[in-house]
Amino acid sequence: MNNPIPSNLKSEAKKAAKILREFTEITSRNGPDKIIPAHVIAKAKGLAILSVIKAGFLVTARGGSGIVLARLPDGKWSAPSAIGIAGLGGGFELGIEVSDLVIILNYDRAVEAFAKGGNLTLGGNLTVAVGPLGRNLEGNVSLRSSAAVFTYCKSRGLFAGISLEGSCLIERKETNRKFYCQDIRAYDILFGDITRPAQAEDLYEVLDSFTEKYEIEGQRVNARRAAREQKKASAKLPPKPSSRPEQSSAQVQLSSGSQSSRNEYNLYPELSSYRERVGNSNQPIEVTALYSFEGQQPGDLNFQAGDRITVISKTDSHFDWWEGKLRGRTGIFPANYVTMN
């Protein structure tokens, strides 16, 4: 466990970076289901990282130190503000426990409540819940939870856990004054009036890595979702006719070309006599594509769902290949991919 005794802001920032790594990296002690998900930190509006000592004999008392940061409008993290934590509890508990805490502030109002007042009492108007664990972005608990504050705790000692209801985060004004060399309030630090100090760069590297992980995980999830949707869409496509027509008018025009061109289209011998020509009728027949079709052989007519195709020749069967024209291109297409207008 880390030292809960208050120290200077540089040491607190270094301690915070170490705690975050311990809470978020997979190790022999921390499996994938025992870490803070990247999206929880990446979407947080504020973050408090502390070490706390708790002692109990009839009445329990807790105290400790750490830092708090806020998310700025541009998505970056603010400079750190030094904080302490204090609280009392009832019940018969005997022992001493040192814990590391990560407190996630999910809403702007939680950050503002601390920044404007200098103190923040957990519980009451700000609901507190144990934060979700694991790497699964698709099970995004934080997006569904109404809790203003998530808490994460790691401890060694006689207590099984720690309750923060009624605990108070306290602004350490003197520590901030010494580090920033001026009298400054937490509000000015957390809302961007102070540039990020170089002494806390290690902490910012850890924090920025969560945004990168979240974006990468999001891209993977979107790719999997798109693949599933594409698979579903493909499963709904009707089968193409098993046999192709013997030649379309577009390919007839090419038959007067070189021998290589004729050989290329030998896979389309001449149209059979039962194919009905419709191009000379007074009212041209139009069909609307129900599905998208991407041709796989020369002479196929590509189209997207919703396109209106003028039919040049057709058969009496919808389970056949018809010939049509679309945007100046002529080719054949599966008739069961379209509907008559």
Curated annotation (Swiss-Prot):
Cellular component GO terms held in the UniProt record: ruffle membrane
Taxonomy, superkingdom: Eukaryota
Coiled-coil region: none
Single Gene Ontology BP annotation: regulation of ruffle assembly
A Pfam family: SH3_9
Residues in SH3 domain copies: 282-341
Residues covered by region (Disordered): 221-265
Biased segments, Polar residues type: 246-264
CDD domains linked to this entry: SH3_SH3YL1_like, SYLF_SH3YL1_like
Molecular function terms, GO-annotated: phosphatidylinositol binding
SMART domains cross-referenced by the UniProt entry: SH3
SUPFAM superfamilies: SH3-domain (SSF50044)
Alphabetized InterPro entries for the sequence: SH3-like_dom_sf, SH3_domain, SH3_domain_YSC84-like, SH3YL1_SH3, SYLF_SH3YL1-like, Ysc84_actin-binding
UniProt entry keywords in alphabetical sequence: SH3 domain
Assembly and oligomerization: Interacts with SH3D19.
Family listed: Belongs to the SH3YL1 family.
Protein name as catalogued: SH3 domain-containing YSC84-like protein 1
